[in-house]
């Protein structure tokens, strides 16, 4: 797993993976991983549904279909966006962004909660479609759910709405909706196995 964004660090912190040195460093950061922890039980629940959106590859979708008990709604869009330069040229298009522009951030997440109990969103295609040129720092603050730190007005509002949404929302980049979800799924099953071994 590439470490490209704070989401990746939070997931590695929660899962305990990445080696002793990395874990020792992560413990010094005192990261809030509560949003990620709230997502874990959904992967194991046959009645649960999750939404995964963004640059979702077929390998990630197949993994989720095979390794989770929940039902998965996938909105895969703008794969190869950066390599093709569609983000820089303004050609990127996102179904989620079309809807978001029509209903606004607060209603967007309320309606998302009617579809699923969890949302994992790669925000980069959405931002590219909307022409939001947020700094790397702002994108990373958004990934962490720290709306108050974000300077770009739309991204600040969107992130705040995600944090106040009636379902757990994980925001991030491409790795969230690929290797990140795989690690979270593995962590969910590992914790369930440990719970069963303890007999609780």
Language model segments and positions:
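Conserved alpha/beta core of the MobA/IspD/sugar-nucleotide pyrophosphorylase nucleotidyltransferase superfamily
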Residues: 1-200
């Amino acid at each position: 797993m590439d470490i490209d964004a704070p989401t990746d660090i939070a997931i590695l912190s929660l899962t305990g993976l990445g080696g002793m040195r990395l874990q020792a460093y992560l413990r010094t950061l005192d990261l809030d991983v509560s949003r990620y922890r709230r997502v874990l039980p959904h992967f194991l629940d046959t009645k649960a549904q999750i939404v995964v959106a963004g640059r979702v590859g077929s390998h990630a979708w197949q993994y989720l279909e095979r390794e989770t008990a929940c039902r998965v709604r996938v909105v895969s869009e703008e794969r190869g966006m950066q390599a093709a330069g569609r983000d820089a040229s303004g050609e990127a298009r996102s179904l989620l962004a079309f809807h978001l522009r029509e209903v606004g951030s607060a209603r967007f997440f309320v309606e998302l909660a009617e579809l699923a109990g969890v949302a994992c969103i790669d925000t980069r295609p959405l931002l590219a479609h909307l022409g939001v040129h947020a700094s790397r720092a702002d994108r990373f603050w958004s990934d962490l759910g720290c709306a108050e730190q974000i300077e770009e007005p739309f991204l600040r509002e969107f992130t705040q709405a995600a944090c106040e949404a009636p379902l757990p929302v994980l925001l991030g980049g491409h790795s969230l909706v690929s290797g990140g979800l795989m690690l979270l799924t593995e962590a969910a099953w590992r914790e369930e196995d440990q719970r069963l071994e303890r007999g609780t």
